[in-house]
Structure formats: structure tokens, C-alpha cells
Amino acid sequence: MNKPLRNSHPLFKIANNALVDLPAPINISSWWNFGSLLGLCLIIQILTGLFLAMHYTADINLAFYSVNHICRDVNYGWLLRTLHANGASFFFICIYLHVGRGIYYGSYMFTPTWLIGVIILFLVMGTAFMGYVLPWGQMSFWGATVITNLLSAIPYLGMDLVQWLWGGFAVDNATLTRFFTFHFILPFIVLAMTMIHLLFLHQTGSNNPIGLNSNIDKIPFHPYFTFKDIVGFIVMIFILISLVLISPNLLGDPDNFIPANPLVTPAHIQPEWYFLFAYAILRSIPNKLGGVIALVLSIAILMILPFYNLSKFRGIQFYPINQVMFWSMLVTVILLTWIGARPVEEPYVLIGQILTVVYFLYYLVNPLITKWWDNLLN
């Protein structure tokens, strides 16, 4: 009997097994839409970024004006730029919801998938940071100076490392050129890592909202989840385009409309909104090296979840106290985001320190509470 081409062609077979005939749990909710939304975000970012790179000039005397030229003189350049800048925000909204879903439903028990996911998160954060430097406005320059300077906290190697990264004794033309190079190449590395992420996920199959084995009750990915994903695409693209066409600079920093000036420091240096929670954690530790360690750990701590799971059930659907803790942690992250945008003065410093302790305690206490709850029900 003749097989359909998608089952016989060596190339189509790979795509078919990942996107068409993939057995998917029948009961996965809309929280499982964010993986495909992240894929869409990545494609949007790569395409808009590619066209922006055709008109951008990575030179400290020209970068700011080349971005200005893109917005004023290039056909639909303003649309490309605002889509790219706001697309990054939507990328992070989706990635944080995706991670939150993984924590809530215990998806971190797919250990290799989870660990690669955390590495992808680090890569995306690095890409976004370097992209923020490229327009060479005030916040670009000072953000780059402050964040790259953190490497100087590394004992013995610190200062040499920073100067090696800068390509000189300060953030200068060499820094901008290499940041542009890395900003261009990293999304393709993220794309490759995403393929590996999916490869490992498809070894085990998807998790589902009740955390039980769903092998006895699966349906093909297409048409059921392709259409469900398309609904998600339409909603996200609608919100993104609405933001881009109504208020494209809502999430940006006004200081970045001023060309970079090494002689004038902005009153308040801060990164884009999606890094503010980590920035608040960095600032809440009075010691420089301690702050850098806390900053890295704020994301890296996600890697301990698969190895520190003490519960009998997968996820926290069946653990009421843990659910309260989870939503409290979400509020903590939102408050940290707010603190990151505030000046370094009381009461903000103290609030930031308390929230930082609460943030890290969640990851340490959460498994213990599940264990206690299991013992209670025995």
C-alpha cells in the first residue's frame, strides 16, 4: 500500500512526526500553547531583525542615526523596528508564562528538556541585552557599561575579562561591533537549541494538566492542536500589532531617544522591563560579587527543580498550600519588577531585599511542603 509522502519522504517524515502525526495528550489546556507562540516570536524576531540588519550600521558615530534613518526613510522601517522591539517584550511574556506553566504542572521532571529550556532562557536574555545596546542611545550605552562591568566582580580575572569583552578600556566602537555580531548569530543558536529542546520533549511526550501518564488517550497533533495554536497566534499577533500601531514606545525608555554620551550619566540606569526582577535581585545584595552570583542564580535556580522534587504527584495541582505559595511567588516577581524600576533609596532597598529572600525561599521550601502534605495524607 502506498504511504502518504509525509510518511515516506526522509525530510517530511521528521516534520510529520513533530507537527502532524505527533501523539498529544487529549486534555492539554491553553497553557500548552506558549511553546508554539515562542516559535512564532522567534521567527518574527529573526525576520524583522534580518531586514533591520540590512540598514543598520554598527559604528558608534552612525548607529543612533542609522536607527533614525530606518524609522524615517526606509519603507516600513518604523514598522520593522517597533515590531522587533515589542516582539522582544512578547517573547519574554511568553517565555515567563511557559516557565511558570512548567513549574506549576511539574513539567521540569522531563529533566533534559527542562535543562535545555533554561539554557535557551539564558541565551535569549543575552541576545535581548545585546540588542538593547545596538541603538546606541543613553540607556543602551550606560546599560552596557553597568552590566558588562559586573564581570569585574570575578576575583583575580575580573578586570582583564571586562577589558577583553569591551575590546578596550571602555565601552566603545569595538564593543558595539561585537555586540551586533553576537546579537545576529545568537537567535540562530537559540533556533538550534529549540530543535534539541523539541527532540528531547518528543522522547517522552507532553505533560498534561493532571500530571498522569496519557499514553492510553492521545490524539494527533494535526488538526486538533494546529488549529488551537493558530487561535493563539491570532490573539498574540493582534495584541502585538495593536501595541505597535497605537503605542510603540510604551515599553521603551525615553532616555534611549538621546544619543549615547559617556560624559552624562542618566539619573536612573535600568534595563528593559523584562530584566527588572533580576536587576532588583542584583541590587538587593550589598556586595558586588554576591549581587552577580544572585543575578545568575535567579535564573539558574530553575535547574535544581528536577533534582529536588519530593512530591508523590506531578505538579502542584493537588497541593493547595503549594498553590498559594506559587501565586505568592508570582506576585513577588511582579513586585521585584516594580522595585527594579525604582531609585536606590529607602524603602525600596529594604523591600527589594525582603522580596529577594522570598523569591529564593520559594524554590527551597516548595518541595518540603509537598513532602509534608503527602505525609499528612498518608
UniProtKB/Swiss-Prot annotation:
The chain crosses the membrane at residues 34-54, 78-99, 114-134, 179-199, 227-247, 289-309, 321-341, 348-368. Changing C71Y: In strain: RU259. Keywords: Electron transport, Heme, Iron, Membrane, Metal-binding, Mitochondrion, Mitochondrion inner membrane, Respiratory chain, Transmembrane, Transmembrane helix, Transport, Ubiquinone. Its cofactor is heme b. GO terms for molecular function: metal ion binding; ubiquinol-cytochrome-c reductase activity. It is found in: Mitochondrion inner membrane. One of its GO terms (biological process) is mitochondrial electron transport, ubiquinol to cytochrome c. PANTHER family: CYTOCHROME B. Heme 1 (or BL or b562) is low-potential and absorbs at about 562 nm, and heme 2 (or BH or b566) is high-potential and absorbs at about 566 nm. This is Cytochrome b. It comes from Drosophila simulans (Fruit fly).
